[in-house]
């Protein structure tokens, strides 16, 4: 979400490719240090950058830091809000994505089948990966039945505050997006 929104806002052309392809495993992954991660970007010259923050920072350096606040205070606030958004909101993101089957299952199945479309049985691979996330990844992030109510109440309180802010300002720090706005897209997308 962070990188996609940054690229769209800055009219930087891109195309998304599934990360479960032979090209990804044989070409991109070794250049990314053997560490899987989404997002990972491969440039036409073969360079690879893995991690949303690193990708946005790369384009910011080429873009005269267009979305990086110029004052120390605003820069610190922007980076703090970015970290809170992209890391601190991961738990509610995972909860709402994976614990509401009636509204999300079809989307998730489609999404994961798309990732594995070049494999012999994309439906089975998608189902297996989804089960792995539910059974292992979510509990590792503290997304367990005992925390669902707390996650939801804290998330609703935060959304209420964000709604109050964004009803007066189009972005976190005023009239143009900053790094925090792109970071907020990470947990809000999908």
Predicted regions, residues:
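GST-like fold's C-terminal all-alpha helical module
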Residues: 91-190
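GST-like domain detector, emphasizing the conserved glutathione-binding G-site
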Residues: 1-121, 172
């Amino acid at each position: 979400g962070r990188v996609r929104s940054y690229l769209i806002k800055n009219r930087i052309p891109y195309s998304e490719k599934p990360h479960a392809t032979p090209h990804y495993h044989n070409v991109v992954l070794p250049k990314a240090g053997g560490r899987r991660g989404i997002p990972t970007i491969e440039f036409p010259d073969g360079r690879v950058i893995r991690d949303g923050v690193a990708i946005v920072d790369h384009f910011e350096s080429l873009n005269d830091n267009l979305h990086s606040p110029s004052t120390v205070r605003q820069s610190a606030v922007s980076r703090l809000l970015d970290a809170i958004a992209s890391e601190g909101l991961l738990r509610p993101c995972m909860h709402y994505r994976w614990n509401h089957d009636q509204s999300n299952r079809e989307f998730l199945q489609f999404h994961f089948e798309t990732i594995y479309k070049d494999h012999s049985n994309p439906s089975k691979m998608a189902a297996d990966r989804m089960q792995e996330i539910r059974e292992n990844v979510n509990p590792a992030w503290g997304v367990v039945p005992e925390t669902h109510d707390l996650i939801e109440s804290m998330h609703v309180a935060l959304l209420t505050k964000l709604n109050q802010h964004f009803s007066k300002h189009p972005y976190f720090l005023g009239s143009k997006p900053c790094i925090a706005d792109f970071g907020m897209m990470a947990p809000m997308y999908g």
